Amino acid sequence: MPPALRVRFAPSPTGYLHIGGARTALMNFLQARRQGGTFVLRMEDTDQGRSTPESVQAILDGLNWLGIDWDEGPGKEGPYAPYFQMQRLDTYRKHADQLIAEGKAYRCYCTKEDLDAQRQVAEKAGGAFKYPGTCRERTEPPAGRNAADAVIRFKMPAGDGSVSFTDKALGTITKTHSDLDDWVMMRADGIPVYNFGCVIDDHLMDITLVARGQEHVNSTFPQLMLYQALGWTPPDFAHLPLILGPDREKLSKRKHPEADVMVHKRNGVMPEALLNFVIRLGWSHGNDEVISREQMLEWFDFSDVGTTSGVWNPEKLLWLNQQWMKQLPVETVVERLLPFLEAKGIQAKGDPRLETLVRTLRERSNTLEDIATTAANVYFRSGITLDEKAATKHLSGESLNLLRKVRETLTALPEWSVEALDGVVKQVSEASSVGMGKVAQPIRVALTGNTTSPGIGETLVLVGRDESLLRIDAALTRG
């Protein structure tokens, strides 16, 4: 029987949760849940200049907002703890010392200046720089240097061999040993580099499948050589397609603000919509576009991941977000809308109009921010600024007379409901022998300032009885 599936997401906490990282985490999470496996969260926090507790928290916040929960990791300590690389330095040192003792790694005393000079020579010759093995056979440090100054390099096997692996997404990939050099495993300060630390951790944490972005394909070859040197069986690999920005360049923290998961939360995107959007950047299920978490859990498999880069399409994300705002229970949307209203100075919790507001505005809004902006500008304020062009057309002459008739009828209306208010429009329309649109537009302009709004009954309910009558009275003063 094969070992139980164990997958991991291992970000470097140097800032916010990147969209590419969120997709990697999501796919690993889905595969683990689908197969009854374990999803591990590990922090590769070895960049001491940039890794901060705030960045760790930003990643945790992003995953929590998306609803991607882990089985082991920060806050959920398991049998393979600790889950921060900086708390595992003794483990890396132990395995580095073992490789040195077995002649499979060595201390390198070359300075940055030495390597820069060698790199310049290679570039002038038109070739790529490869470490020439200057310290490969050294048994003692050169004069003036000691072991504390040395990095530790992996000793690539001599000869014309090759290394290959079969990727679950990309198929079989091969490189010759001559394409690889003696790469640095440990820095002089005892901190492991990526290729070394992740292999040690993946093995000791019993990770059975490593799924990560295609930018890590070339890292897989030195990692496989390390597995071989340590006598370990490597996990399976799946490399996921790149995500490109709208400019078709790799989605980057420096160039693309949309790379930050939490930007979308602040913009009023629903987590269901963002998950739906990112899963389809490299994976699809037939012609299905709106895909729920439950459907992802049923359908997703790494073997179905494509190889073509996904391109960020902001219009598609907004479309999906509108679909999700319309599909989710109105109570859920109301709860998520409240912080956006509060940010605009509107304390609306418990306001009986909120459910009607959401039902009405989500049909014509792309984000929670859109709904909140419309609510603040039209429904949760005193008075309204009229669009002069709309007012000139719809608040003069016969239109104003129709509005007066509406005002008179509203005064005596016992029930301020959508049905009753729509009935007023119909009543005035029939009594005046004009179409309902002729009656509705003056009301709409008086209430909202322009010619577009939800239905008249809904708009009157949202503005409220007292404020509606005040706005209509203000409009009638134009006559």
Curated annotation (Swiss-Prot):
<keyword id="KW-0030">Aminoacyl-tRNA synthetase</keyword>
<keyword id="KW-0479">Metal-binding</keyword>
<keyword id="KW-0067">ATP-binding</keyword>
<dbReference type="GO" id="GO:0006424">
    <property type="term" value="P:glutamyl-tRNA aminoacylation"/>
</dbReference>
<dbReference type="Pfam" id="PF19269">
    <property type="entry name" value="Anticodon_2"/>
</dbReference>
<dbReference type="InterPro" id="IPR020058">
    <property type="entry name" value="Glu/Gln-tRNA-synth_Ib_cat-dom"/>
</dbReference>
<feature type="binding site">
    <location>
        <position position="110"/>
    </location>
    <ligand>
        <name>Zn(2+)</name>
    </ligand>
</feature>
<dbReference type="InterPro" id="IPR049940">
    <property type="entry name" value="GluQ/Sye"/>
</dbReference>
<keyword id="KW-0547">Nucleotide-binding</keyword>
<dbReference type="InterPro" id="IPR001412">
    <property type="entry name" value="aa-tRNA-synth_I_CS"/>
</dbReference>
<comment type="similarity">
    <text>Belongs to the class-I aminoacyl-tRNA synthetase family. Glutamate--tRNA ligase type 1 subfamily.</text>
</comment>
<dbReference type="GO" id="GO:0004818">
    <property type="term" value="F:glutamate-tRNA ligase activity"/>
</dbReference>
<keyword id="KW-0648">Protein biosynthesis</keyword>
<feature type="binding site">
    <location>
        <position position="253"/>
    </location>
    <ligand>
        <name>ATP</name>
    </ligand>
</feature>
<keyword id="KW-0862">Zinc</keyword>
<dbReference type="InterPro" id="IPR008925">
    <property type="entry name" value="aa_tRNA-synth_I_cd-bd_sf"/>
</dbReference>
<dbReference type="GO" id="GO:0008270">
    <property type="term" value="F:zinc ion binding"/>
</dbReference>
<feature type="short sequence motif" description="'HIGH' region">
    <location>
        <begin position="11"/>
        <end position="21"/>
    </location>
</feature>
<dbReference type="InterPro" id="IPR020751">
    <property type="entry name" value="aa-tRNA-synth_I_codon-bd_sub2"/>
</dbReference>
<dbReference type="GO" id="GO:0000049">
    <property type="term" value="F:tRNA binding"/>
</dbReference>
<dbReference type="InterPro" id="IPR033910">
    <property type="entry name" value="GluRS_core"/>
</dbReference>
<feature type="binding site">
    <location>
        <position position="108"/>
    </location>
    <ligand>
        <name>Zn(2+)</name>
    </ligand>
</feature>
<dbReference type="GO" id="GO:0005829">
    <property type="term" value="C:cytosol"/>
</dbReference>
<feature type="binding site">
    <location>
        <position position="135"/>
    </location>
    <ligand>
        <name>Zn(2+)</name>
    </ligand>
</feature>
<dbReference type="InterPro" id="IPR045462">
    <property type="entry name" value="aa-tRNA-synth_I_cd-bd"/>
</dbReference>
<dbReference type="InterPro" id="IPR000924">
    <property type="entry name" value="Glu/Gln-tRNA-synth"/>
</dbReference>
<dbReference type="InterPro" id="IPR020752">
    <property type="entry name" value="Glu-tRNA-synth_I_codon-bd_sub1"/>
</dbReference>
<comment type="function">
    <text>Catalyzes the attachment of glutamate to tRNA(Glu) in a two-step reaction: glutamate is first activated by ATP to form Glu-AMP and then transferred to the acceptor end of tRNA(Glu).</text>
</comment>
<keyword id="KW-0963">Cytoplasm</keyword>
<keyword id="KW-0436">Ligase</keyword>
<dbReference type="Pfam" id="PF00749">
    <property type="entry name" value="tRNA-synt_1c"/>
</dbReference>
<dbReference type="GO" id="GO:0005524">
    <property type="term" value="F:ATP binding"/>
</dbReference>
<dbReference type="InterPro" id="IPR014729">
    <property type="entry name" value="Rossmann-like_a/b/a_fold"/>
</dbReference>
<comment type="subunit">
    <text>Monomer.</text>
</comment>
<feature type="binding site">
    <location>
        <position position="137"/>
    </location>
    <ligand>
        <name>Zn(2+)</name>
    </ligand>
</feature>
<dbReference type="InterPro" id="IPR004527">
    <property type="entry name" value="Glu-tRNA-ligase_bac/mito"/>
</dbReference>
<protein>
    <recommendedName>
        <fullName>Glutamate--tRNA ligase</fullName>
        <ecNumber>6.1.1.17</ecNumber>
    </recommendedName>
</protein>
<feature type="short sequence motif" description="'KMSKS' region">
    <location>
        <begin position="250"/>
        <end position="254"/>
    </location>
</feature>
